[in-house]
From Swiss-Prot:
Keyword Membrane recorded: no
A Pfam family the protein falls into: Glutaminase
Family: Belongs to the glutaminase family.
EC supergroup of this enzyme: hydrolase
Protein name according to UniProt: Glutaminase
Organism, scientific name: Pseudomonas putida (strain ATCC 700007 / DSM 6899 / JCM 31910 / BCRC 17059 / LMG 24140 / F1)
Length: 302
């Protein structure tokens, strides 16, 4: 596995320079674009890393999986009364579909859906940001994971569109807490700093029927795990979920920080990171690396 990971990174490295970092978030525009890392974590606790796999980066929308899992953990099926689990077919920050469907987001991985999930968690936890940080520390086994307040503040300054979604949902009765408070929590979740190994380990319960082996916790039931993985497969990569299924064939979740996590049910979790994005907002080199890894090992679930 180690040799294969090293080879794959060398094969996709020429793609660096052909994408673009997420410069619409000022704090992310400064991230050196020439970084590339990958980590594979097995259900037996073994792992392999290559490249910049231990360099922390901003997880961004990958955090939407953590907040969804938290909400399912304390509220169960009730969360689906407030949002759906269908692909949207619209940009992740679109207001059009949200208006048409009367404030009920299509799924928890578009921004409107993630905001509803944050609203649900805001009602549950006295300190949602700290609860999220501690939850991720537990899942990853890394007690030093932190929130980059510079990134969170940077995103909050440019919050207008997300605020518009929240207020629109509030007008339809689907947002219960103070909008600005929930936005602060939302951007703090996105600003979690983790590396490839942290993320691969933190997501391993999704490859293991909801059981996190290193913490000894049953995070989700087997059925809930299947549900989360299915939404990742259909909606986890913005408008490129179909292309990801075609090329990689695994449930996955990406973020504009350049990270992508993929689940090999029953076996492994993989995280790849390269900051430069393609036109759909997903890591250009990361997509290519996961495609090579999946095809050479035969991991596709299809």
């Amino acid at each position: 596995m180690q040799t294969l990971l090293n080879e794959i990174l060398e094969e996709v490295r020429p793609l660096i320079g052909k994408g673009k970092v997420a410069d619409y978030i000022p704090a992310l525009a400064d991230v050196p674009a020439n970084q590339l890392g990958i980590a594979v974590y097995g259900n037996d606790g073994s792992y392999h890393c290559a490249g910049d796999a231990r360099v922390p980066f901003s997880v961004q929308s990958i955090s939407k999986v953590f907040s969804l899992v938290q909400a399912i953990g304390h509220s169960g099926e009730a969360i689906w009364e407030r949002l759906g689990h269908e692909p949207s077919g619209q940009p992740f920050n679109s207001l059009v579909q949200l208006e048409f469907e009367r404030g009920r987001p299509r799924n928890p991985f578009i921004n409107a859906g993630a905001l509803v999930i944050c609203d649900i968690n805001q009602s549950r936890f006295a300190a949602p940001t700290l609860s999220m940080r501690d939850f991720v520390r537990r899942l990853s086994g890394n007690p030093h994971i932190s929130i980059n307040t510079r990134v969170a503040d940077s995103e909050y300054q440019f919050r207008a569109r997300n605020a518009a979604m929240a207020y629109l949902m509030q007008s339809f009765g689907n947002f219960h807490n103070e909008v600005e408070t929930v936005l602060r929590s939302y951007f703090s979740y996105c600003a979690l700093q983790m590396n490839c190994l942290d993320l691969a380990r933190a997501f391993c319960f999704l490859a293991n029927d909801g059981f996190c082996k290193h913490s000894g916790e049953q995070i989700l039931t087997r059925r809930q795990t299947q549900q989360v993985n299915s939404i990742m497969a259909t909606s986890g990569l913005y408008d490129e979920a179909g292309n990801f299924a075609f090329r990689v064939g695994l449930p996955g979740k990406s973020g504009v920080g350049g990270g992508i996590v993929a689940i090999v049910p029953g076996q492994f979790t993989v995280c790849v990171w390269s900051p430069e994005l393609n036109a759909a907002g997903n890591s250009l080199a990361g997509m290519a690396a996961l495609e090579l890894l999946s095809s050479r090992i035969g991991w596709s679930v299809f």
